Amino acid sequence: MNLIVEICSPKRKTKYDLVAVHKQDLGWVNMDSQAPNKVVGEWLAKQGYDYIRPEFTYGKSRIDFYMEKGEQKYLMEVKGCTLEVDGIGYFPDAPTERGVKHLHELAQAQRKGYQCAVAFVIQMEGITEVRPNVRTQPEFGTALAEAKAAGVQVLLLLCRVGRDSLEIMEQRKG
């Protein structure tokens, strides 16, 4: 069972969006590529930051979120995890040079005094672990390990997923 939504816009290449799929062992898997940033923005608003700015330019990248709390500056890149194999989430589900670039930028920013994190929004229920999908893109696994070594935090954001909803329920360190 899938949830497909018709979008009428002359600017689009396609007329429909795949919003969710129903997987027998997992239930609903949210496939909306824009949902992770939306729910993280809502979640960050409840985390006590003094200032939150989406789509922040750092270096040669657009990082998903810039935040401030007191004197401390934060950068967060958001990744939506929709691939599951044997109860484990994997990212990316397709090669992403942009994702590798963002991890390098976060590591550099961390070394310059920012507090940086990459947040994996797990877009399905019952998954509590996300691993780099080195089979699809080994460079992402290397870049993630280097970012962690530089002090970049890895956050796992566990969600409640409905047919047309996604809500962050729990944060864990990855």
Predicted regions and their residues:
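Basic nucleic-acid-binding interfaces
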Residues: 1-3, 26, 117
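Flexible glycine-rich surface loops and low-complexity tracts that mediate binding to linear polymers
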Residues: 1-11, 158-159
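Short nucleic-acid-contacting surface segments enriched for D/E, G, S/T with interspersed K/R
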Residues: 1-4, 102, 107
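Domain-level recognition of nuclease-like catalytic cores that cleave nucleotide substrates
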Residues: 123-174
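OB-fold/S1-family single-stranded nucleic acid-binding modules
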Residues: 10-25, 168-169
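Conserved catalytic cores of phosphodiester-cleaving nucleases, focusing on short active-site segments
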Residues: 63-93, 106
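Acidic-basic catalytic patches of nuclease active cores, encompassing PD-(D/E)XK
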Residues: 25-54
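Nucleic-acid nuclease catalytic cores
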Residues: 87-97, 107-136, 158
